[in-house]
Structures are given as structure tokens and as C-alpha cells.
Amino acid sequence: MGCCGSSTVDAEEHLDYSGGNVTLVTDQKNWDNTMEEVAEHGKTVVLKFSAIWCTPCRNAAPLFAELSLKYPDIVFVSVDVDEMPELVTQYDVRATPTFIFMKNNEEIDKLVGGNHEDLQEKFEQLNRPKLYDDV
């Protein structure tokens, strides 16, 4: 799997999302519970596929946590590609970080890479009011 820049690091076991409202998925049961809750409430969810060894993933973690506070109606989920390879295959993740935006269990957008401006723009697009239903 590709990474937008990687290095070996002596880091914590998971990326640091302290101060944010990010659910860290580490096993299938946790994933199932999280997605059930999302489905019950009809919320938009953003999946961040990342790895501890990926420098852009680590760099994007504080912004992801910040966005989780800015957009409380969106569910933020972090998936470690090394711990959940079946989800990597299911969502066709080919590089880290990859952000997948979902609504009603359907993928509505995808962003590959850790560019902060691009990520912020995706959230702004997602939250813009639509003037017409058919646009």
C-alpha cells in the first residue's frame, strides 16, 4: 500500500486525536457497533484510513480532531490499515491517508492524501447548503 511519505518511527500504538471526537476502530466488533450507531441516526461519517508509520497520517491527525469538534453532526472514524485490512480491501484503499465521506452507508466523496487545505475544502463542500434538491 502506498503512503504519501513514510518513515519508521518510535511512536505510540495509535495516532493522537486528543481533544477531538474521533472514534478509533481497532476490531470488527468496534466497527460494527460504530456503523450501527451511524445508521440508526442517519449521520454522515468520515472514515480516515491511516497508519502510525505514515508521516502525513500523523500530520493530519490534529486537523482531523479539530474538524471533529467543528462539525459535531458528522461522525469521525479512524481506521488503522494494519489492524483492519478487510476494511482496506472493502473500501479499495490504496494509499494512506485516505478519507472516505459516507451518507446512508453510501460513499459520497473520497480524498487521498494529507493536504490540509484539500481536507478542509471537502468539509466545507459537504456542509454547504444546497439551493436546489436536484443540484
From Swiss-Prot:
KW Disulfide bond (keyword) present: yes
PANTHER family per the UniProt record, alphabetical: THIOREDOXIN-LIKE PROTEIN 1 (PTHR46115)
Keyword set, alphabetical order: Cytoplasm, Disulfide bond, Electron transport, Redox-active center, Transport
Location of the active site: 54, 57
Protein name, entry field: Thioredoxin H5
One Gene Ontology cellular component annotation held by this UniProt entry: cytoplasm
Entry's family note: Belongs to the thioredoxin family. Plant H-type subfamily.
Listed Gene3D superfamilies: Glutaredoxin (3.40.30.10)
Taxon lineage: Eukaryota, Viridiplantae, Streptophyta, Embryophyta, Tracheophyta
Annotated Pfam families: Thioredoxin
Stored SUPFAM superfamilies: Thioredoxin-like
Free-text function comment from the UniProt entry: Probable thiol-disulfide oxidoreductase that may be involved in the redox regulation of a number of cytosolic enzymes.
Source organism, top-level taxon: Eukaryota
InterPro entries: Thioredoxin-like_sf, Thioredoxin_domain
Cell location: Cytoplasm
Cystine connections: 54-57
Location, primary (coarse class): cytoplasm
Domain Thioredoxin per the UniProt entry, residue ranges: 13-128
